[in-house]
Amino acid sequence: VARDTSPQCKQCRREGQKLFLKGERCFTDKCGVERRSYPPGEHGRGRLRQSEYRVQLREKQKTRRYYQVLEKQFRAYYDKASRQDGVTGENLLRLLESRFDNVLVRLGFAASRRQARQLVSHGHWMINGRRVDIPSYQVRPEDIISIKPGSSATETIQRATELVSTVPAWLQADHDALTAKVLRYPERSEISAPVQEQLIVELYSK
């Protein structure tokens, strides 16, 4: 499966904010954004003129990096969102939030989306009693998420639960039993991603 292998701390520095790509490290003073709050590269400390197109492009790139989605897949999400009823930008975020790997992070069952992707790909999680090993799987209301019996990742997952303070209202989690339920799809106000989705819509509408 193709993925972005560029250094994660540099991805955050390039966007000028924490995207929480490295799990526990992002909550410490070792965070790259905390240590170097300017973009990577020889001219990172300089300021480039921000054209409208550049601002829109940066917002799209930041969103892709936040959700750890490649360009082709991101465009497919946008195309699907644009065909749905409602506001395209909100539809896009709802699709991204409903990815299985993202949901595990929101539930506190993974410290980062990369870790969540590994846990899913290695078959440690089930949905409605069936093993699901596709990180991009779209969860639906009433889905029951549970750890596979006998999973060797239990300790890693329990450690991740210690990093989360609250679980979004559209999800319900039992951190002791390592089970969860999708209550409904998220409202825009419940999506904490640092994204201005209208800029992405404007970019793709050109």
Task: Name these PLM-found stretches.
Residues H124-W125, R130, G150:
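Short, surface-exposed secondary-structure boundary micro-motifs
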